[in-house]
Amino acid sequence: KGKTAILIDDMIDTGGTICSGANLLKKEGAKRIFACASHAVFSPPSYERLSSKDLFEQVIVTNSIPVIDNYDFPQLKVLSVANMLGEAIWRIHEESSVSSMFR
Protein backbone atom coordinates (compact mmCIF):
# COMPACT_ATOMS: atom_id res chain seq x y z
CA LYS A 1 0.00 0.00 0.00
CA GLY A 2 1.21 3.45 -0.91
CA LYS A 3 4.20 2.13 -2.91
CA THR A 4 5.32 2.52 -6.52
CA ALA A 5 4.91 -0.68 -8.56
CA ILE A 6 6.81 -1.57 -11.72
CA LEU A 7 5.42 -4.32 -13.96
CA ILE A 8 7.99 -5.81 -16.36
CA ASP A 9 7.16 -8.17 -19.22
CA ASP A 10 8.84 -9.27 -22.43
CA MET A 11 6.01 -7.97 -24.62
CA ILE A 12 2.65 -6.27 -24.55
CA ASP A 13 0.25 -7.72 -27.10
CA THR A 14 -3.40 -7.08 -26.20
CA GLY A 15 -2.45 -5.60 -22.82
CA GLY A 16 -4.66 -8.05 -20.93
CA THR A 17 -1.97 -9.57 -18.71
CA ILE A 18 -0.25 -6.33 -17.75
CA CYS A 19 -3.55 -4.53 -17.14
CA SER A 20 -4.81 -7.40 -14.96
CA GLY A 21 -1.65 -7.12 -12.89
CA ALA A 22 -2.00 -3.35 -12.66
CA ASN A 23 -5.64 -3.61 -11.59
CA LEU A 24 -4.68 -6.02 -8.82
CA LEU A 25 -1.87 -3.72 -7.65
CA LYS A 26 -4.23 -0.73 -7.69
CA LYS A 27 -6.81 -2.71 -5.69
CA GLU A 28 -4.09 -3.53 -3.14
CA GLY A 29 -3.22 0.16 -2.79
CA ALA A 30 -0.29 0.83 -5.13
CA LYS A 31 0.32 4.57 -5.32
CA ARG A 32 1.91 4.64 -8.79
CA ILE A 33 2.11 1.91 -11.46
CA PHE A 34 4.60 1.74 -14.31
CA ALA A 35 4.52 -0.86 -17.12
CA CYS A 36 7.69 -1.82 -19.00
CA ALA A 37 8.10 -4.21 -21.94
CA SER A 38 10.76 -4.89 -24.55
CA HIS A 39 8.38 -5.51 -27.43
CA ALA A 40 5.24 -3.48 -28.17
CA VAL A 41 3.08 -5.75 -30.32
CA PHE A 42 0.01 -3.65 -29.43
CA SER A 43 -2.80 -5.74 -30.95
CA PRO A 44 -6.37 -4.57 -30.43
CA PRO A 45 -7.71 -3.80 -27.79
CA SER A 46 -4.40 -2.76 -26.20
CA TYR A 47 -4.85 0.95 -26.94
CA GLU A 48 -8.08 1.19 -24.95
CA ARG A 49 -6.62 -0.84 -22.08
CA LEU A 50 -3.26 0.92 -21.79
CA SER A 51 -4.40 4.49 -22.33
CA SER A 52 -6.74 4.43 -19.35
CA LYS A 53 -5.74 7.61 -17.52
CA ASP A 54 -6.19 6.17 -14.05
CA LEU A 55 -4.21 2.91 -14.41
CA PHE A 56 -0.61 3.56 -15.47
CA GLU A 57 1.62 6.51 -14.70
CA GLN A 58 3.79 5.48 -17.64
CA VAL A 59 3.97 2.64 -20.18
CA ILE A 60 7.57 2.21 -21.35
CA VAL A 61 8.45 0.08 -24.41
CA THR A 62 11.25 -0.15 -26.96
CA ASN A 63 10.98 0.29 -30.70
CA SER A 64 12.15 -3.29 -31.38
CA ILE A 65 8.77 -3.50 -33.14
CA PRO A 66 7.79 -0.19 -34.78
CA VAL A 67 4.98 1.54 -32.91
CA ILE A 68 2.46 2.89 -35.40
CA ASP A 69 2.28 6.68 -35.56
CA ASN A 70 -1.33 7.06 -34.48
CA TYR A 71 -0.80 4.80 -31.46
CA ASP A 72 0.02 7.50 -28.98
CA PHE A 73 -1.26 8.43 -25.56
CA PRO A 74 0.26 10.65 -22.85
CA GLN A 75 1.59 7.78 -20.71
CA LEU A 76 3.44 6.04 -23.60
CA LYS A 77 7.24 6.35 -23.76
CA VAL A 78 9.08 4.59 -26.60
CA LEU A 79 12.82 4.04 -26.13
CA SER A 80 15.07 3.50 -29.14
CA VAL A 81 17.24 0.39 -29.34
CA ALA A 82 18.86 1.52 -32.60
CA ASN A 83 22.31 2.33 -31.17
CA MET A 84 22.47 -0.90 -29.20
CA LEU A 85 21.47 -3.03 -32.20
CA GLY A 86 23.92 -1.19 -34.44
CA GLU A 87 26.73 -1.75 -31.95
CA ALA A 88 25.85 -5.45 -31.67
CA ILE A 89 25.86 -5.85 -35.46
CA TRP A 90 29.22 -4.08 -35.69
CA ARG A 91 30.75 -6.28 -32.98
CA ILE A 92 29.50 -9.44 -34.69
CA HIS A 93 30.96 -8.21 -37.99
CA GLU A 94 34.28 -7.48 -36.28
CA GLU A 95 34.15 -10.84 -34.43
CA SER A 96 34.36 -9.13 -31.04
CA SER A 97 32.37 -9.64 -27.85
CA VAL A 98 28.69 -8.72 -27.80
CA SER A 99 28.27 -9.83 -24.18
CA SER A 100 30.73 -7.17 -23.01
CA MET A 101 28.13 -4.55 -24.00
CA PHE A 102 26.02 -5.70 -21.07
CA ARG A 103 28.61 -5.75 -18.29
Label every PLM stretch briefly.
Residues K1-R103:
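PRPP-associated nucleotide enzymes
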